Amino acid sequence: MKPDAHQVKQFLLNLQDTICQQLTAVDGAEFVEDSWQREAGGGGRSRVLRNDGVFEQAGVNFSHVHGEAMPASATAHRPELAGRSFEAMGVSLVVHPHNPYVPTSHANVRFFIAEKPGAEPVWWFGGGFDLTPFYGFEEDAIHWHRTARDLCLPFGEDVYPRYKKWCDDYFYLKHRNEQRGIGGLFFDDLNTPDFDHCFAFMQAVGKGYTDAYLPIVERRKAMAYGERERNFQLYRRGRYVEFNLVWDRGTLFGLQTGGRTESILMSMPPLVRWEYDYQPKDGSPEAALSEFIKVRDWV
């Protein structure tokens, strides 16, 4: 089937609505919407929830941009895209909870299509979701990865292991020699065997995110915590900022295409701290995190 960008866009708009409704049901607060237009072509809907409830900040962004030439961040690993016009659309979200026992989560699903006269379109899907705990709970990690594995199974037994490894490899801070979190799924450049198959997989990932995340939120949101746990959460959020500004391809793509800076940087935590040469106390729950986030098979 020929790629249908309109069909993908409608799914993404509905997905944004659904995820916002589900997060509001947990938190009680409403998202504030900010619709924007991109001067060079396209626009989007940025939605942000900020309050003193379960989520300190949650951002769920839809964007649909188009232009006459692909940016350097995209053509660097796909030189055949040079000289083509493009459309890029997606839903990207990050949830930063108040409670340090509730992990931060990130999800993204996206579609690219690049065209030029007299040539077949070049298109692909990408996306995934990943979890960044501050305090590790094995049952949460197992649930997260089991949900990821189960949504992948209808598409092939090799899909989950392949995209889990890609996630582990991608969300890695080289300058710290550590993972950003416990991973999940990451895929990109997906265009085989055909459009319908790839679109169905992208939909499964988009819908699977809340199945993976919300049960963990419900399990941890009422746990008691104090200043020590909060300070550690803010310190570890620094890793999130470092990854997004130094390594993340999506951030680079958005900035290089003249995307809306407020929406691109919506993933940043509202509060964060750095501490020079911080060393957690031996045997403490904080010290245990470095082992917990090391790559392993959770299911």
Curated annotation (Swiss-Prot):
Region ranges (Important for dimerization): 240-275
SS bonds (residue pairs): none
Annotated positions binding a divalent metal cation: 96, 106, 145, 175
InterPro entries tied to this protein: Coprogen_oxidase_aer (IPR001260), Coprogen_oxidase_aer_sf (IPR036406), Coprogen_oxidase_CS (IPR018375)
Annotated compartments: Cytoplasm
Subunit structure comment from the entry: Homodimer.
Protein name, per record: Oxygen-dependent coproporphyrinogen-III oxidase
Organism: Shigella boydii serotype 18 (strain CDC 3083-94 / BS512)
